[in-house]
């Protein structure tokens, strides 16, 4: 039942350094595409785009 969950847990990775920094949930019905947010990356020490990894 978890495989068809409407709100799965996803991991966000930094676009610059590829480090996986954040874990969040998303709604598959509202956001079927890959999620992208601007978050702080401690490795880059800057606000960078973080994209959903699969």
Curated annotation (Swiss-Prot):
Can you quote a single GO CC term?
Answer: ribonucleoprotein complex
Q: Which Gene3D superfamilies match?
A: Ribosomal protein L33
Q: Which Pfam families match?
A: Ribosomal_L33
Output one GO MF annotation. Answer: structural constituent of ribosome
- The entry's keywords: Ribonucleoprotein, Ribosomal protein
Q: Which GO terms describe its biological process?
A: translation
Question: What InterPro entries does the database record attribute to this sequence?
Answer: Ribosomal_bL33, Ribosomal_bL33_CS, Ribosomal_bL33_sf, Ribosomal_zn-bd
Question: Which PANTHER family does UniProt cross-reference here?
Answer: 50S RIBOSOMAL PROTEIN L33, CHLOROPLASTIC, LARGE RIBOSOMAL SUBUNIT PROTEIN BL33C
Q: Which family does it belong to?
A: Belongs to the bacterial ribosomal protein bL33 family.
Q: What's the name of the protein?
A: Large ribosomal subunit protein bL33B
């Amino acid at each position: 039942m978890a495989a068809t969950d409407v709100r799965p847990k996803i991991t966000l990775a930094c676009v610059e350094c590829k480090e996986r920094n954040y874990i969040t949930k998303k709604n598959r019905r509202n956001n079927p595409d890959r999620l992208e947010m601007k978050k702080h990356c401690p490795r880059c020490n800057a606000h960078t785009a973080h994209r959903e990894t699969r």
